[in-house]
Amino acid sequence: MLIEDAVSSGTPQFVIDSYATLAERAKTQSFGLIEEDVIVLDTETTGLSVQDNELIEISAARLSGREIVDRFDTFVHPKQLIPAEITELTSITNADVADAPSAVEAVAALADFVGGCPVIAHNATFDRSFIESVKGGVNVSDIWIDSLALSRIALPRLASHKLSFMADLFGCDSVSHRANADVDALCGVWRVLLVALTDLPQGLMARLADMHPDVPWSYRPIFSFLAGQNPGSIFSLSAARADVLKADRADDRVDADELPVLKMPSREEIEADYAPGGLVNRMYPTYEPRDEQIAMALEVRDALVTGTHRVIEAGTGVGKSMAYLVPFAEAARRNNITVGIATKSNNLADQLMYHELPKLAEQLDGGLSFCALKGYDHYPCLRKLERMSRGQVEITTKRDPADTLTAVAVIMAYVCQSADGDLDSLGIRWRSVNRPDFTTASRECACRLCPFFPDKCLVHGARRRAAHADVVVTNHSLLFRNVAAEGRILPPIRHWVIDEAHSIEREARRQWARVVSADESRVLFERLGGSSTGALSQVSRDLATSEGSTLYLGLTAKATSTVARASMAIADVFDGVRELGRRARGGYDNANLWIGPELRESDDWHDFLQSAYAAIDALEQADKSVDALVQAVAADKPEVVVDLGDISRRLHELAENLKLIIDGTDEHYVYSLQVNRRLRAGGESMTAERIDIGEALATEWLPEVHTAIFASATMTVSKSFEHFNHAVGLDRIGASTSSSLHLDSSYDFDSNMAVVVAGDIPDPRDRESYLTALERVLVDAHLAMGGSVLTLFTNRRDMEDLYTRVEPKMARAGLELNCQQRNSSPRRLRDRFINEPTSSLFALKAFWEGFDASGETLRCVIIPKLPFSSPTDPLSCERNLREDRAWARYSLPEAVLEVKQAAGRLIRSSTDCGVLILADPRLVTKGYGKKFLTSLPTSSYQRIESAQIGHYLQLWRARHERRR
């Protein structure tokens, strides 16, 4: 493997050249004491979880310089049988371990071998947890060095830090998923890592070795030794950033506002791109032209030419991303402008960034430049990183502070070898590290007060590079935050694709909400601190010996006093919110109460206003006193109050948001309060949400955009775009400025998808009869399909009740049924569902859309209840107050679109087939039921008595299996 192929895209050439010589230099370079008497270790186990699995092999080697001078290898006899998949992975059989020592005996022998020396392991937390779970394991060593984390510091630009990847790249012994072979590989990689550390900027090793000396950190001796090889070197982050940015230059772009019309390919040229042997065929040799895809590409091309908008519903299989990428790329290249693509999901963004755009760039003469742009909190703040590395700020994590030091080292190395980039791929343990210590928000950015602003900053550098790229890929969240920030986050992009557009109204409402949160307020006041902690304390220490300190300290004392009063006052507000939350009806875990006329006229609200007004007054006093301190100090020592200025703006925002909600007269908003019923305290919030997102988009965003392509597989209700056009404001800007297009899927839904309506399920208000009938449908469906069933619930209570009834019956039948329990990871549930072909899942909102499981993994989707918003939902209540027939205009089409999204989980490829079961009796008892059925991708459905569903599914399954 070539180094060029092993590093991340955009790696500077000087870094590639350095990495290319590491293996040779590792053969001759010496590192004295830090490679004498160190132990390299690896283990094999029966599984990943230390709670449920055991050791089956331990291997270790003692290093002295470049030589292995002693070995330790043993199988371990587990109490359980080795799973078949582990045997397949490792080749370790039950016969191999039958006569092996017990875990206690093996670990005791290991402890004798190690003799307290430092232990190196790749992902050391895993090996250490298994070793120390055995009696006597804690005696093996006090010093464990994780070579995985160290590799991220030493080689931050590698595309992967897996041991097998690095061993192959640097010509070390190969990895075979056996402990002894992995140890041999790591022995070679270890020396490469030491050499790579010496290539980092001069003085960095000393900076890392010296930071926060009170924190025990296993890497400190390594960095200290390497620093001693180059004594007296002083590290400059600013100079390191300047070095890495030398070659980072880009051409200026034209603002599309300056162009009277775009130069675009003809319709015939676009058609040729999708023809056999054309551009797309060169990207994908097995590509077959699709009429629907060509029609969409032509529609996108025409929209760009005319400067108008399009709403395109493209069914599954159309290939919509390639349909818009080609004309948008041509628009960017031919006009020297930047175009934008906004997605909802990371999966689609990754598909564009790492697959489709690179392939497209390879086939276009002159290439194509593209980049991803994320929110501020995805990028490291160099000012905060510098202060943390110098020990100028406290480590705020409540977990192991050593993880924070490791994060500093990883990020510092990365920014010294990367012109751009973000935190998401660095492998930092954010559960143990306080992310805000390393990031900033747009409203908190110090800008001109920051020594790295603008060119050396990764946040502003990313924005600058985006402004010079042909194509920018971002997400819906950042797009709408940019609208709220009046264009200060994204470069001026006038041509957009909004993919996965069915969800943008909801996302815009979330991004534009004004929130007063107990948890965020607590963090805010913790950051402000007081006489001994937080930003106020830091300012006092920084100013204690400066000229004018008497004035400054007096202002600090006043700010500390007013902040303490404000903290207590806002806590009283959240106590009042919790009391008001008792009035909320419905809601299993969370109460969501509309702050409407009835509540505002109640005695409870008038009592609550006393604490609310007191808090507003206290917050305003605190805001004034903190701002006075910031202004006074900033005139002389602006760098001292940068952090305090950031927090001061948050304090002002908190006061303004509380005033807005308590006043409640701005008719653009709906007001509500939220309480977590499972907590005695904490989790309370008050929210103001924009009601009419379409109006806001029509006045604040669409006038700035020449062309917006809204694309999704789920936009129409009974073949009408009316609901979507209203939701995004296209019906407010003139009919001539936009048009809509529906493109059928290229898949045969009528043959491959069956829709079953269980019309005899009792009314859910008769809860026991309803649950009993639904239980029978669920059991029969799971048994008939042999698993691979996804059941999508609208509320947790029904889901958990039915899970306790259905799961034991599935277990007796040998079928696995999982449930989206509280605090469970949606990603792990997805992975489990996909990796176990016969497993089934009961799930909530996170699985209604964006969940792809093709083939036999998913054969049946069950929707027990239509996903109407709750009648007590604050937005629904506000709409009902303001409009007649609000339910039919908003709640009904939104529910239809959610059902369409859920149905879309079934057919993800041309060979997929499956059954959608709708078990809500309202589909046949209410007139609106037809809207759901006529909006589905297949026009036919079967109404079947619930007792016959199991038999129908057996016949359906047999018929489709014969077809295969």
Predicted segments with their positions:
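Signature of the SF2 helicase/ATPase Hel1-core->accessory helical subdomain module
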Residues: D350, S442-V471, H476-A614, T714-L730
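A contiguous, basic/glycine-rich beta-loop/short-helix subdomain that forms a polymer-engagement track
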Residues: P436-D470, F480, A485-G487, A615-G759, ...
